[in-house]
Amino acid sequence: MFNVILVAPEIPPNTGNVIRLCANTGARLHLIEPLGFPLDDAKMRRAGLDYHEYAEMRVHRDWDAFVAAEAPDPARMFAFTTRGSGRFHDHAFVPGDWFVFGSETRGLPADVLERFPNEQRVRLPMRPGNRSLNLSNTVAVVVFEAWRQAGFEGGA
């Protein structure tokens, strides 16, 4: 299935929502430290309800530790950013792809973003003049589009 990577998430309910999303879609969740909250944060657990036990979640101390542990295919990694030039719906996603998202207030760190070629820096369309969409909403849009492209494989 797909892989969701949150780099330094800051807001517990957003991460809780993403945990619930991953549990319901079969996506794997990777959290890259530092996290803006402890993993047992009540707000995160409340947002994720009882889905934590159904989600496959891994925590990595930093970007390099994540890459070393998971060995993702660089050609199948996509950085979602308001500074992206590509439109996400122009990509053909396949199971196993890696979707990378930055923190709610800062987005992806420059040292992570610069590792992605321009064609893999993608954005969701939105109205001009707006800063960004909510992190968990963005993740949901991306995961469901990718899953749709895969024919909702494994879904009921």
From Swiss-Prot:
GO terms for cellular component: cytoplasm. Belongs to the class IV-like SAM-binding methyltransferase superfamily. RNA methyltransferase TrmH family. TrmL subfamily. One of its GO terms (molecular function) is tRNA (cytidine(34)-2'-O)-methyltransferase activity. It holds the Pfam family SpoU_methylase. The keyword Transferase applies. The keyword Translocase does not apply. It comes from the Bacteria. Its main location: cytoplasm. Signal peptide: none annotated. It is an enzyme of class 2 (transferase). Its EC number is 2.1.1.207. Homodimer. This is tRNA (cytidine(34)-2'-O)-methyltransferase. S-adenosyl-L-methionine binds at G102, L124, S132. Methylates the ribose at the nucleotide 34 wobble position in the two leucyl isoacceptors tRNA(Leu)(CmAA) and tRNA(Leu)(cmnm5UmAA). Catalyzes the methyl transfer from S-adenosyl-L-methionine to the 2'-OH of the wobble nucleotide. It catalyses: cytidine(34) in tRNA + S-adenosyl-L-methionine = 2'-O-methylcytidine(34) in tRNA + S-adenosyl-L-homocysteine + H(+); 5-carboxymethylaminomethyluridine(34) in tRNA(Leu) + S-adenosyl-L-methionine = 5-carboxymethylaminomethyl-2'-O-methyluridine(34) in tRNA(Leu) + S-adenosyl-L-homocysteine + H(+). It is found in: Cytoplasm. Keywords: Cytoplasm, Methyltransferase, S-adenosyl-L-methionine, Transferase, tRNA processing. NCBIfam families: tRNA_yibK_trmL (TIGR00185). One of its GO terms (biological process) is wobble position cytosine ribose methylation.
